[in-house]
């Protein structure tokens, strides 16, 4: 009898290991349902988003914005733009921080041309994507509180957060929310809708974040080439026409011209530009009251 009980016990244990107790499955069934607001429902209706896809999309749109990297913008969405960007000055900004790069320019502003600046906070702020912000670039040597390596992995064949990517110019605090909007709407969105989820359209303003910042050593008084003209510089950023092909032709932005006629709130009233400094511990800190987005209140801060 004892032997039979023992065998039955072993069988029962085996069944539990294979199929589980059913508790996890039951918990999964009771997963909290996502309730959409009237505004969200109307927006998804307009975009004709399938009911089963709405919960995931709205979850991403409600979360705090974070940087996701230029590679996320590539693939089935913006391949031509990504390819053009990799060949642009912004697609190689991190490389300029390496020893031996741009020797003449560095000597001109009294920087050591043989020094490695790829972990220097003041440089990383403007030479990478989202440094010192949620989801942003983390240099070599970065560790979590538990000592885990958190440095951003760099693939030389696929530029990403280590360069000045899409989000540095097109988003307020990272493109995670906006990416959900683009995927759900399939490009059928207005400027106002995108601004609600972190897109910015004040490009001439946002460029001053780095190109004319008080801490940049590359000032006009050093050399005329450092005079910043937005209209001239933007022509070097996206030479898209050279990168359309049969594989990405279906990604052309059908609503681009239509949106160009719209005027976003950020175009009427530009957002604040973050000021920053390096503290006594050598870390980059944003000056209080200068951020364009308040993540706690979920509000945007405009220039007065």
Residue ranges and their predicted role:
Residues 188-219:
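Repeat-solenoid scaffold signature
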């Amino acid at each position: 009898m004892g032997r039979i009980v023992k065998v039955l016990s072993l069988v029962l244990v085996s069944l539990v290991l294979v199929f589980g107790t059913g508790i996890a499955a039951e918990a999964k069934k009771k997963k909290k349902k996502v309730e959409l607001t009237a505004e969200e429902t109307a927006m998804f209706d307009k975009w004709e988003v399938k009911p089963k896809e709405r919960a995931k999309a709205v979850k991403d749109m409600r979360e705090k914005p974070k940087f996701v990297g230029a590679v996320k913008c590539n693939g089935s969405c913006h391949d031509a733009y990504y390819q053009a960007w990799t060949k642009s000055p912004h697609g190689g900004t991190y490389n300029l921080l390496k020893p031996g790069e741009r020797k003449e320019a560095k000597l001109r502003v009294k920087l050591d041309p043989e020094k490695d600046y790829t972990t220097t906070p003041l440089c990383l702020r403007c030479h990478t994507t989202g440094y010192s912000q949620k989801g942003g670039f983390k240099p070599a040597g970065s560790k979590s509180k538990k000592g885990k390596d958190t440095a951003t992995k760099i693939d030389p064949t696929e530029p990403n957060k280590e360069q000045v990517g899409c989000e540095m110019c097109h988003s307020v605090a990272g493109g995670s929310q906006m990416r959900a909007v683009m995927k759900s709407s399939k490009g059928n969105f207005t400027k106002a809708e995108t601004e609600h989820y972190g897109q910015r359209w004040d490009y001439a303003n946002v460029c001053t974040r780095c190109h004319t910042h008080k801490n940049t050593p590359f000032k006009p008084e050093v050399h005329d080439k450092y005079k910043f003209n937005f209209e001239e510089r933007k022509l070097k950023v996206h030479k898209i026409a050279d990168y359309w092909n049969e594989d990405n032709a279906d990604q052309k932005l059908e609503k681009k011209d239509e949106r160009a006629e719209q005027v976003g709130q950020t175009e009427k009233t530009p957002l604040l530009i973050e000021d920053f400094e390096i503290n006594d511990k050598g870390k980059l800190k944003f000056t209080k009251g200068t951020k364009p987005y308040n993540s706690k209140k979920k509000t945007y801060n405009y220039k007065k």
